[in-house]
Amino acid sequence: MKTFNQFGQPVGEALSNWQPRQHPSRVVLQGRYCRLEPLRVEHANALFSAYSLAEDTRSWTWLLREPDATAEEFAEWVANVSELSDPIHFTVIDNQTRSPVGTLSLMRIDPKNGVVEVGHVHFSPLLSRTPMSTEAQYLLMRYVFDTLGYRRYEWKCNSLNEPSRKAALRLGFQFEGRFRQALVIKGHNRDTDWFSILDKEWSALALSLIHISEPTRHAQI
């Protein structure tokens, strides 16, 4: 809603009751098909094996880092990032097999303004294009909006990454625009596409996603 100041200038909607939100925690988020656990070194070998099921390394093309040549290299990366407070990496655990099948994270965390981005999404062939993949995204969204009370949830990707762009739209993100020449990644220019979901959009969106997930619970660890 547009409001006006004493000079008759349009200013943003007044948020007189707004308070900074809590920083996301290392929580477990339980769903029907999968659960999210904070990334731990104990997940590394199973994750490396799951990623190795891919026929090639094309799933790494859009990531910020190159593929790890060995399980030891991957485990070292996990050890380096698993205790970070931003980004907070989560492992997706298949409820049937109880095995790690992918990762995603909360990043660029801004509690003061209630803004956070989902990123570092890397799903193995065991997770991609399954009900688990949508549920994993839903569980993280629900935590951000319903538990933490954030106002804005972001998704950013390389403008050439068509699968990521389609996934964002399928999950209910709204395209906001393109930041040209935003980054240099692996020696190549990257134009970055921005997407978002707002808190006022979440209730309706959750209804469209809820059929794939039973009520969730989370427990801090």
Predicted features by range, described:
Residues 2-41, 45, 55-60, 213:
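Conserved N-terminal entry element of GNAT/NAT acetyltransferase domains
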Residues 55, 59-114, 121:
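A conserved beta-strand-loop-helix scaffold within acyl/acetyltransferase catalytic domains
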Residues 109-119, 128, 149-151:
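A conserved beta-turn-beta hairpin within the catalytic core of GNAT-like acetyltransferases
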Residues 146-156:
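Conserved GNAT acetyl-CoA-binding A-motif
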Residues 155-165:
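Conserved beta-strand-loop-alpha-helix junction that forms the acyl-donor binding cleft
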Residues 174-188:
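Conserved catalytic-core motifs of GNAT/GCN5-like acyltransferases
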Residues 210-221:
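Single conserved hydrophobic/aromatic residue that forms the stacking wall/gate
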